[in-house]
Amino acid sequence: MRILHVVPTYLPARRYGGPIVAVHGLCKALAARGHEVDVFTTNVDGDRTLDVPESKPVDVDGVRVTYFPSPFRRLYWSPAMRKALAVRIRTYDVVHIHAVYLWTGIAAARAARNARVRYVISPRGMLVHELIRRKSRMVKTLWLRLLERRGFDAAAAIHFTTVLEGQEAARIGLPLPSPFVVPNGIDLVPRPNIARDENTLVFLGRVTWKKGLDRVLEALPSLANVRFVIAGNDEESLTPKLRELAQKLGVADRVEFLGPVYGAAKYELLARATLFVLMSTSENFGNAVLEALMMETPVVLSQEVGLAAEVARAGAGVIGLEEVPALLHDRGRRTRMGRHGRALVESRFSWPRIAEEMERAYAAL
């Protein structure tokens, strides 16, 4: 199959977190299965521009990636991408569009309709009622009604990463033709042979309001001698407010902010953690959850995390901070959870398996 993925940003723009890594993992795994995979994206990297060739293909792990310049960065508008879509989109069997509220998705859907090419849309967690309500509600509502609706209506299918994400999207009122669920995957690596810390909670991810870091801080006063390590890019400048809250709660000496952590250092951090915590108010999937499970670290999740129910069923973690004290005092239970978590990742979330599932979904369009 010839497959085109259209995404507003791409590696090496790691500041955008899990969705970027997930899209690249999927593209790489599809290419490894023999498919011809192209990515159209922009060179936007926050307020900077990626140091990559413009408007010509670059090989990234076997995936042909074309980075187009974007004069209007906020919406990722790119005349060069529009021209390329008009010329080349009819050469693909399937177009896979990632993200909403951005020009790239609207342009790709329009070009695919004009060329009568089947396309799939992955909202990537952006169609969540609570997120729309809390941030730019009027703008997002009008955008969906006036600009996105036609694209969704004509899509061959809508892809979600979890059942929960699909349920949330259904509340928005957009047409969701032929919805299907294929989760994100992960590249399997062994757990490093290092000792695990005692009484240490770890969060890994983008530091944003929806991640529920305040929930964990507010629980710390009742968790004597427990440290909380926060690792991730602070794209909303929340760290000063979180430090202030920790000071107010009297736990500032037990909270550590590491900033972004990548590669081997990331896995060492997760492998040392006693527990991984993610108390998001909204989380369509949670790639860091898979990374923690792969390091045999039990996870503590809010019920709003898309993976929470599956993790709990597998015995690899718990839902709710109220479970933390009992877990901290039961090393045997944590060890069993760690083994269950690793087994879950290996059996369900390896990229070869996920690519095979997505391939079947494409073939069924």
Annotate each predicted stretch with a short phrase:
Residues 45-46, 204, 227-243, 259:
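Glycosyltransferase donor-sugar binding loop
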Residues 333-348, 354-360:
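A short, well-ordered alpha-helix in the C-terminal region of glycosyltransferases
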